């Protein structure tokens, strides 16, 4: 299947690892000109919570961007009572404000150039909050889904199609790195990381966690010319963890 991405400028935030890195690789394989954004190990290195970051990312594009993938994010396995105001603000600034500023900067440029694609990487926790992750993550990921829908309604008529992908648990660095979610949950439960990972896998209808590449495949399709009639959608890529009728 030809996706029509050859030569198109595509920006991926959080592009240095996990889902973002897999998305950047897959877009490159389709012939896109990819610009990754992250704090480290990226084409554009900056803090996306800086109010000026969106303009700097747009300025770094060699020409009008075709696709923006808002993937940058973070999570911790913390109980609600442990969260401070600063913790809530950190999640809000990264998941909501950074995404909004980038969309606000990119959508007009895309519209002037004839159209484009924006994909926000939310989470199944934004559709059904998870007690495994901190409440600020679930709440801000839900806000990101709402933000996607608002921008989709505003920009579809000008050829800028905005959608979201809501992954379930993904077996990537966020989960498996030392000190990552598996270790954090193990400490909370008094178990070990392998027990946590196996429990997370077994609770999913498909019997396993997703790979970054499986999430990236959905993102890349939504970035493509083939997704020309998809706008305002929120695609669950979660192994069946969120009921279809949610």
Where is each model-derived feature located?
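Substrate-binding pocket helix/loop in short-chain dehydrogenase/reductase
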Residues: 79-80, 87-92, 118, 182, ...
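Active-site helix of classical SDR
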Residues: 103, 140, 148
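Conserved mid-core segment of classical short-chain dehydrogenase/reductases
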Residues: 75-89, 112, 132-136, 176
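Residue(s) in the substrate-gating loop at a strand-loop-helix junction
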Residues: 123
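Short C-terminal tail/terminal secondary-structure segment
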Residues: 1, 128, 208, 219-220, ...
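Alpha-helical segment proximal to the catalytic Tyr-Lys
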Residues: 108, 153-154, 228
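Short, small/polar-rich loop/turn modules that mediate ligand/substrate recognition or access, typified
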Residues: 156, 161, 230-232
């Amino acid at each position: 299947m030809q996706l029509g991405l050859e030569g198109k400028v595509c920006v991926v935030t959080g592009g240095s690892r996990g889902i973002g890195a897999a998305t950047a690789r897959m877009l490159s394989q389709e012939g896109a000109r990819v610009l990754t954004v992250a704090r480290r190990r990226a084409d554009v290195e900056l803090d996306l919570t800086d109010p000026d970051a969106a303009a700097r990312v747009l300025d770094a594009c060699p020409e009008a961007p075709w696709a923006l993938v808002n993937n940058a994010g973070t999570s911790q396995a913390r109980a609600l009572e442990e969260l401070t105001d600063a913790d809530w603000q950190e999640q809000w600034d990264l998941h909501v404000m950074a995404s909004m500023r980038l969309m606000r900067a990119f959508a007009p440029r895309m519209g002037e150039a004839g159209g484009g694609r924006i994909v926000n990487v939310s989470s199944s926790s934004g559709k059904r909050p998870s007690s495994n992750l901190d409440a600020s993550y679930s709440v801000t990921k839900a806000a990101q889904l709402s933000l996607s829908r608002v921008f989709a309604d505003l920009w579809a008529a000008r050829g800028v199609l905005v959608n979201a992908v809501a992954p379930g648990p993904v077996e990537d660095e966020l989960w498996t790195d030392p000190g990552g979610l598996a270790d954090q949950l193990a400490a909370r439960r008094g178990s070990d990381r392998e027990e946590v990972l196996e429990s997370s896998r077994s609770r999913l209808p498909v019997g396993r966690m997703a790979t970054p590449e499986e999430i990236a495949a959905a993102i890349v399709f939504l970035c493509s010319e083939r997704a020309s009639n998809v706008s305002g959608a929120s695609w669950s890529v979660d192994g069946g963890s969120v009921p279809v009728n949610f």
